[in-house]
Every structure is written in C-alpha cells, then in structure tokens.
Amino acid sequence: FNPCPYSDDTVKMIILTRENKKHDFYTLDTIKKHNEFKKSTIKHQVVFITHGFTSSADTENFLAMAKALSDKGNYLVILIDWRVAACTEEMSGIQLAYYSYAASNTRLVGNYIATVTKMLVQKYNVPMANIRLIGHSLGAHTSGFAGKKVQELGLGKYSEIIGLDPAGPSFKSNDCSERICKTDAHYVQIIHTSNHLGTLVTLGTVDFMNNGYNQPGCGLPLIGETCSHTRAVKYFTECIKHECCLIGVPQSKKPQPVSKCTRNECVCVGLNAKTYPKTGSFYVPVESKAPYCNNKGKII
C-alpha cells in the first residue's frame, strides 16, 4: 500500500522566464515544445524550485518567488511539481498520516531533477556553475538528493543549493548521505524558521536562524508552526527583491545589532550570500510584516 506513489510520469514542470510567464505544465517528453528548449543552447542562469509535503508548484508563494527571480536576473526558472508523490491530492484529514511516504519519495524526485540537469548540461550546454536549486521543507532534502545524484553522474556540483526550512521529521537525525548536506553543492545556504516542521540542526555552509524558530506575526509557538515554516519561502523572495533585506549576525556575536555589521563578519541572506567570506551559523532578526527586512536600508 502506497497512497502517494512516485513515478516520473506524475512529475510536471512549470518553466518561467521574463518573456514567458505562462504557467503551463511540461513533462520530460513535452519540454521540447517550450520556446527555450527549442534552442540549441540555453544561455540563462537556471533555478529549480521544489515544493514540499502536500504542496504544489503553482501555489502563490512559489510563483511569487519565480517572478522575483525572472524580474531580477532574467533567470530560467523550473518549478518542479511532484504533488502526487507529496500526498497533496489525498484528503486533508489523512494527509499527515502519509508523511513518511512523501519523505521516502524525496530521493526519487531528486533523481528526476538530476535527469533534467543532465539534459540541460549535455544537450543545451548549460554549465553546472549556472544552475542553482531552491527547495522548501521536503523540497530542500529533494534538492540535496539531486546534488548527490549529479555528482554520482559525473556532472560535478551545482553552484548552490538553498534549503528553505528543511523538513525536520524523518531527516534531522540522519547523517549527511540521507538529508540535505553542505557537500551537496559548492555552497549550501539554509534558512531555518521553525523547530518542529523544520529543524534547528545546522545543515549547510551557512545556516541562518531567523528569529530563532518562532516567526513574528505567526502567533503562539506550535499553533503558528505552519506559518513559521512557510515564512522561509516569503523571506527568501523578499531577499531576492531587496538586496541585504536580511542580514545575519554570527551566532557567536549575538545579540550584536545588525547596524554594527561589516561585510567581513556578517552575511546577507539571498542570491549573493556566497560572495561573503564568513560561513557557519548566523542569527537573523526579522520584522513581523512583509518585506520583513532588518537592514533599514543598509547594504554590506
């Protein structure tokens, strides 16, 4: 009995660029019908976005992130929709009981992303340095598994994987080979926003602890857990739109205010985090309302 079975046929992709914002779904077979995939070379930087448990690629938060990316840097954004294997189509009352099935599908979805990556590299001449993955919750571990698989296939490493509140249950006590891990890409950026659905275990090159684990504006701990878990997606979207929106202070320097930050000791959450010299764990104060920024206009 597997209520949320995985098969390549049930995974779909939405492909967005600045010129083409249609939310059409493609498969490995039909992807060649998309204008970008009719070309012999894809010159865009490519970003994969992968959702988590009981979610889908066409939810408002992920489409907003994709739009921010294509507006900002004319990225080619591939949203991976694995809703069947993520138990999204099951009845809401019993979905939670099926979590372990979705969790065990993450490696298979990761392998799928690696297959698409191989096609991008070998058929469309996209260098691995031009590809990053962003994943939320179970999608963060999926992205990690994709990072392991492309190395296994001899393609090298992705430039970056960004894990947005990686799922804690079934993963937080796993060793590196069974979860997202800092060796899965050249740079692995983790944004932690919850303690039960997510985890406060450090997993990446940099780990940002946003306000600890209970996000402002999300209500009481536990009751606001889903809101806190989802905030990671919203925070990162704002960090794409606003440079240095969220600045991380080294955990060892907490409670040093963000205003005292320099480029050599603090790190800005976002697409440019990897250009900062410091690695490790960072504390990130956040505001309770969008755009959540803590930098008061400061850029380091």
Swiss-Prot record:
<feature type="disulfide bond">
    <location>
        <begin position="245"/>
        <end position="293"/>
    </location>
</feature>
<keyword id="KW-0964">Secreted</keyword>
<feature type="disulfide bond">
    <location>
        <begin position="4"/>
        <end position="87"/>
    </location>
</feature>
<feature type="active site" description="Charge relay system">
    <location>
        <position position="229"/>
    </location>
</feature>
<dbReference type="InterPro" id="IPR002334">
    <property type="entry name" value="Allerg_PlipaseA1"/>
</dbReference>
<feature type="disulfide bond">
    <location>
        <begin position="244"/>
        <end position="268"/>
    </location>
</feature>
<feature type="active site" description="Charge relay system">
    <location>
        <position position="165"/>
    </location>
</feature>
<comment type="function">
    <text>Catalyzes the hydrolysis of phosphatidylcholine with phospholipase A1 activity. Shows potent hemolytic activity that is responsible for its lethal effect. May act as an allergen. In vivo, induces local inflammatory effects.</text>
</comment>
<dbReference type="Pfam" id="PF00151">
    <property type="entry name" value="Lipase"/>
</dbReference>
<dbReference type="GO" id="GO:0016042">
    <property type="term" value="P:lipid catabolic process"/>
</dbReference>
<keyword id="KW-1015">Disulfide bond</keyword>
<dbReference type="GO" id="GO:0008970">
    <property type="term" value="F:phospholipase A1 activity"/>
</dbReference>
<dbReference type="GO" id="GO:0005615">
    <property type="term" value="C:extracellular space"/>
</dbReference>
<feature type="disulfide bond">
    <location>
        <begin position="261"/>
        <end position="266"/>
    </location>
</feature>
<comment type="similarity">
    <text>Belongs to the AB hydrolase superfamily. Lipase family.</text>
</comment>
<dbReference type="GO" id="GO:0031640">
    <property type="term" value="P:killing of cells of another organism"/>
</dbReference>
<keyword id="KW-0378">Hydrolase</keyword>
<feature type="disulfide bond">
    <location>
        <begin position="176"/>
        <end position="181"/>
    </location>
</feature>
<protein>
    <recommendedName>
        <fullName>Phospholipase A1</fullName>
        <ecNumber>3.1.1.32</ecNumber>
    </recommendedName>
</protein>
<dbReference type="InterPro" id="IPR029058">
    <property type="entry name" value="AB_hydrolase_fold"/>
</dbReference>
<keyword id="KW-0204">Cytolysis</keyword>
<dbReference type="InterPro" id="IPR000734">
    <property type="entry name" value="TAG_lipase"/>
</dbReference>
<feature type="active site" description="Nucleophile">
    <location>
        <position position="137"/>
    </location>
</feature>
<feature type="disulfide bond">
    <location>
        <begin position="218"/>
        <end position="227"/>
    </location>
</feature>
<keyword id="KW-0354">Hemolysis</keyword>
<dbReference type="InterPro" id="IPR013818">
    <property type="entry name" value="Lipase"/>
</dbReference>
